[in-house]
UniProtKB/Swiss-Prot annotation:
A Gene Ontology cellular-component term: cytoplasm
Residues binding Zn(2+) 2, per UniProt: 94, 97, 100, 108
InterPro entries assigned to the protein according to its UniProt record, in alphabetical order: ADH-like_C, ADH-like_N, ADH_Zn_CS, GroES-like_sf, L-Threonine_3-DHase, NAD(P)-bd_dom_sf, PKS_ER, Zn_alcohol_dh
SMART domains per UniProt: PKS_ER (SM00829)
Source organism superkingdom: Bacteria
Subcellular location: Cytoplasm
Annotated Zn(2+) 1 binding sites: 39, 64-65
Annotated organism of origin: Anaeromyxobacter sp. (strain Fw109-5)
Protein name per Swiss-Prot or TrEMBL: L-threonine 3-dehydrogenase
Alphabetical UniProt keywords: Cytoplasm, Metal-binding, NAD, Oxidoreductase, Zinc
Cofactor binding notes: Binds 2 Zn(2+) ions per subunit.
Gene Ontology biological process terms, A to Z: L-threonine catabolic process to glycine
Length: 343
């Protein structure tokens, strides 16, 4: 089968045409992939950065954002059948640790990542445990279903705290950040302000519903808050950038008693003014992945009640032009990039 493989310990990802079709275990489902999306993680793997060198076994079929149809099921699988349209949770958990048994599988200490620690979905076929398969309703388009993984990150982060009537600050206008903007507006936030230094992505944030999209290299966030009539700071912060300066600016802009959800991963150690956290009584919450499967339920429910995340998909390529997809993702001048397998 065709697959995109990290086959060398160097910058790049390469297509092969002779990867073996994965076998199906008794508790597994094999999915024929229709569309894949490129994740920021895939770009890290492409770049072969420090994290990738520590983490990715080579060779590895990468990718974990996709939609497809069930091709085959294992002998013990009863919930899915060939032809079902599905996507899949990219975190494979142990099922037996304390958190898994308590229903907190997103906090499993033994998580294995599809396309990171086990073969991924940049391939004509991918195999995952049946417990990780999620059926896609007929009224959700393929290309939207293909980005359920990052949409789930945005949903988990945005819905961590009450948003109705609140003023929300989103730091980082990448695809997950701008989807969080749309979610916050959809569920009833008042002002949703997003900060970044990338004008292309700030423009995308405006299209996704941001009250204000602020280039902090040129604009003063405090002046924007004053212009919006905000006197006490933001009530909820969604840190999506992984940038220490953005996080510190967020802490300064939060109201007393505010709540901050952090999804962005900062490189190394970042110093902050902890007195801001203590004296403001801030609540900080780390976010990882998606709650299994409450986040998925909410993702579908919001789409079916009018949320439109489709503007975040800005580029589409056939799979044989995957290099163009990675090039545009690496340029920073895109939202989500979807690759079509032509099946």
């Amino acid at each position: 089968m065709k697959a995109l493989v990290k086959s060398r310990r160097a910058e790049g990802i390469w297509m092969v045409h002779d990867a073996p079709v994965p076998e199906v275990g008794v508790h597994d489902v094999r999915i024929r992939v229709r569309k894949s999306a490129i994740c920021g993680t895939d770009v890290h793997i492409y770049n072969w950065d420090e994290w990738s060198q520590r983490t990715i076994p080579v060779p590895m079929i990468v990718g974990h954002e996709y939609v497809g149809v069930v091709d085959a099921v294992g002998g013990e699988v009863e919930a899915f059948h060939p032809g079902d349209r599905v996507s899949g949770e990219g975190h494979v958990t142990c099922g037996f640790c304390r958190n898994c048994r308590a229903g907190r599988r997103h906090l499993c200490r033994h998580t294995i990542g599809v396309g990171v620690n086990r073969p991924g979905s940049f391939a004509e076929y991918v195999v995952i445990p049946a417990d990780n398969v999620y059926r896609i309703p007929d009224d959700i388009p393929d290309e939207v279903a293909a980005i359920f993984d990052p949409y789930g990150n945005a949903t988990h982060t945005a819905l961590s705290f009450e948003l109705v009537g609140e003023d929300v600050l989103v730091t980082g206008a990448g695809p997950i950040g701008v989807m969080a903007v749309s979610i916050a507006r959809h569920v009833g936030a008042r002002h949703v302000v997003v900060t970044d230094v990338n004008d292309y992505r700030l423009g995308l944030a405006r299209r996704m519903g941001a009250t204000r999209a602020v280039n902090v290299a040129r604009e003063d966030l405090r002046a924007v808050m004053k212009d919006l009539g905000m006197k006490e700071g933001f009530d909820v912060g969604l840190e999506m950038s992984g940038n220490g300066r953005a996080f510190r600016q967020m802490l300064e802009a939060m109201n007393h008693g505010a709540k901050v959800a952090l999804l962005g991963i900062m490189p190394g150690e970042e110093a902050i003014d902890w007195s801001q956290v203590v004296f403001k009584g801030l609540v900080l919450k780390g976010i990882y992945g998606r709650e299994m499967y409450e986040t998925w339920y909410k993702m579908v429910a919001m789409l079916q009640s009018g949320l439109d995340i489709s503007p975040v998909i800005t580029h589409r390529f056939p799979i044989d032009e995957f290099q163009q997809g990675f090039d545009v993702m690496r340029s920073g001048q895109s939202g989500k990039v979807v690759l079509d397998w032509g099946t």
